[in-house]
Amino acid sequence: FQGPLNFSFDPAVLSAYIAELKQLEPTVTPTLATFYHLVQLSARKEAFINELPMETINPLYKTILGEFSVKRWLAADAAQVEWNEEEAAYLLEIVKALDEQGIKLLVGSDAGTMYMPPGSSTHDEMTLMIRAGLTTRTVLAAATINAAETLGVADRYGSIEVGKVADLVLTAGNPLDDLQTLRRPLGVVKTGQWISEEQLEALRESGRHPSNFYISLGRLLEDLLRRALQ
């Protein structure tokens, strides 16, 4: 939107660019969730932050994000909020147009930006792709087989087939009917190893206790020093 379309909301400009883009046979990762996050920060401010699983974010990283990215959007005025909301709505239209023209899409949330937690932000991304008008089958393909094909590992990953690595999720409902069932799986098979619902909850609980600020700062400084001496 910012680049090729030069902030234009003109459908004709979008159509012409997608026609040109299609000649390249590209793969596109929309990252709708990160802009949605930006919109919510600018519009709802602290009320939105209070709804986020902030306990899962490393405290050092949280401080850095707050200073260098979040603060800007918390200070957004009404005019900026209106622009953000208009752009967010048009981003959905762009994704729908890309899909209609047969552009291969991937699921990627850009987790880690602006207090976006990994994991749940991927589900948010898929929800937004549905909101854009894509089918659940298209979104699931974008999260699985499309990604495997793009990375060149579709012979081993991306679908449930004989001979492929056993990576799959067991859900209470059919994701083709409702993607939200993926948010609380009954179990996961990772490289053939069964991870039960209880074990998944234990992993979630562990994620709520990241390393503390000073240990993280020490590790960061150690890494920077190591890089400087290379």
Report residues per predicted region.
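Active-site neighborhoods of metal-dependent hydrolases
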Residues: F1-A132, D223-Q230
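Active-site microenvironment of metallo-dependent hydrolases
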Residues: E100, T127, R137-Q230
